[in-house]
Amino acid sequence: MHSMISSVDVKSEVPMGLEPISPLDLRTDLRMMMPVVDPVVREKQLQQELLLIQQQQQIQKQLLIAEFQKQHENLTRQHQAQLQEHIKELLAIKQQQELLEKEQKLEQQRQEQEVERHRREQQLPPLRGKDRGRERAVASTEVKQKLQEFLLSKSATKDTPTNGKNHSVGRHPKLWYTAAHHTSLDQSSPPLSGTSPSYKYTLPGAQDSKDDFPLRKTASEPNLKVRSRLKQKVAERRSSPLLRRKDGNLVTSFKKRVFEVAESSVSSSSPGSGPSSPNNGPAGNVTENEASALPPTPHPEQLVPQQRILIHEDSMNLLSLYTSPSLPNITLGLPAVPSPLNASNSLKDKQKCETQMLRQGVPLPSQYGSSIAASSSHVHVAMEGKPNSSHQALLQHLLLKEQMRQQKLLVAGGVPLHPQSPLATKERISPGIRGTHKLPRHRPLNRTQSAPLPQSTLAQLVIQQQHQQFLEKQKQYQQQIHMNKLLSKSIEQLKQPGSHLEEAEEELQGDQSMEDRAASKDNSARSDSSACVEDTLGQVGAVKVKEEPVDSDEDAQIQEMECGEQAAFMQQVIGKDLAPGFVIKVII
């Protein structure tokens, strides 16, 4: 039995660094056989074994703690990564939700707008029907006129392909009339370019009476649905004075213009020749060519307004007035004429030739029988030197007006042969002829109209003011040049007293004799002015001549010379018709 019991070895799991301890013998059967050990030794062994066990437990505890810390760190890292990914997913989901909400809001707004638009569209027809019964604001006559012109131009564009290019001047007298009389009030603004602005105007063709109805009246003037009443309104509109310009002194009826041309054609053999035409050059040829290009008319009365209109057009081209840059130039139906700058260049060449003839002493052939007035005006233009474009155009306009006035004086009491521009005069026919031939007038208007002032008086006032200002500036400039010459001459004389002693004495004697002669006429004025000038010169110390110090013997002579020169200079200044009390300070 004892042989079967094997020895049991207990191996301690101690690291290699510790000291090896002898194994503990736990056999009981051997004790009995072995002798009894000392208890002190036995107690020491037990204590050593307890210490060893405690050390092993501490080591195992440390190992477990280290392993736990490693696993805890790994788990925290994984948890943080998962949290970050989760946060990212949440943010992405939130952004998607916001985008979806925005899209839904936009879609809702679009749907609401569409619903609102449909609702408004459904409500608009009854509102329009309700507004038709109510009263509206009355449109002004100018607005109606603009709308009528727009409709006429529209109908003209429709009729142009059928009628072709055979539009004559006599078929549309009203359009020629408005083109001739539509000049701007802003006459002082120069043209911006040499050519007139290219506005597209179309000549209306032959208008059908069926389609030529007036515009629909406003609600305050009830709608007219009866055809007979519409025809009556068409007739009234054709003869209504609303379509004409509101300047009563400039505007005459078409029948009166026909009568005037008839009278002028009786007095003159041909409208485009003789003293009645201001232009014997290319403009007259234009009128003849255009008159020949007109289609033959069965009645001679239809040719008269055409001639009148063409002559009026030539007068307007000859004037070449300014046009406002803010308003369009109405060149409806007018032929291709030279620009205002080209016209001014031609007039400038003509004036140069006439001034050369005047310098040579050759009398100028005047168209209106008044060569003196024309030559004086040309000399006035030549005296300017090189004026700017605005002054040149003003002087050309004044020259033409002076020629027209001379013609009126020559042909006093008769019909004026030259068709004047609307800015020149407002009287077309003499009062005797108007008294004998009175044409029926239109019925008076229903209400008053606020029209601007007549263009003739306004333009004349502007031109007169500008001309007066220009003359005043010229006069002041000449006076300034004259005074500068006198001052420079006197200063040179004072700077060189020794060389001009004899001349100063001679001038002093001559001035004294002239002063004695003129003393009876203006003694008081000159005495006052001379006293004022001498006092001021005495106070200021007017003339100080810087020279080298001279001997005491020559002091008296120099003082006498200076006094004589001062007196001569003051007498020269006073003798030039200056205002009394005019003081001149000479500083050397």
Curated annotation (Swiss-Prot):
Compositional bias per record (Low complexity), positions renumbered to this chain: 264-284
UniProt-annotated stretches for the region Interaction with ETV6: 218-261
Organism: Mus musculus
Tissue specificity statement from the Swiss-Prot or TrEMBL entry: Expressed at high levels in heart, brain and spleen. Expressed in skeletal muscle.
Gene: Hdac9
GO biological process: B cell activation; B cell differentiation; chromatin organization; determination of adult lifespan; DNA repair; heart development; inflammatory response; negative regulation of DNA-templated transcription
Induction / repression: By MEF2 during muscle differentiation. Down-regulated by muscle denervation. Down-regulated by trichostatin A or sodium butyrate, and during neuronal apoptosis (at protein level).
GO cellular component entries: cytoplasm; histone deacetylase complex; histone methyltransferase complex; nucleus
Residues covered by region (Interaction with MEF2): 136-154
Family in the record: Belongs to the histone deacetylase family. HD type 2 subfamily.
A single MF term (Gene Ontology): transcription corepressor activity
Subunit structure: Homodimer. Interacts with ETV6. Interacts with MEF2, HDAC1, HDAC3, HDAC4, HDAC5, CTBP1 and MAPK10. The phosphorylated form interacts with 14-3-3. Interacts with FOXP3 in the absence of T-cell stimulation.
Free-text disruption phenotype from the record: Mice do not present any abnormality at early age but develop cardiac hypertrophy by eight months of age.
Reaction(s) catalysed by this chain's protein: N(6)-acetyl-L-lysyl-[histone] + H2O = L-lysyl-[histone] + acetate
Residue numbers spanned by region Interaction with MAPK10: 175-343
Region entry Disordered, spans: 110-170, 183-242, 264-301, 493-533
Residues carrying Phosphoserine: 22, 220, 240, 450, 552
Descriptive protein name: Histone deacetylase 9
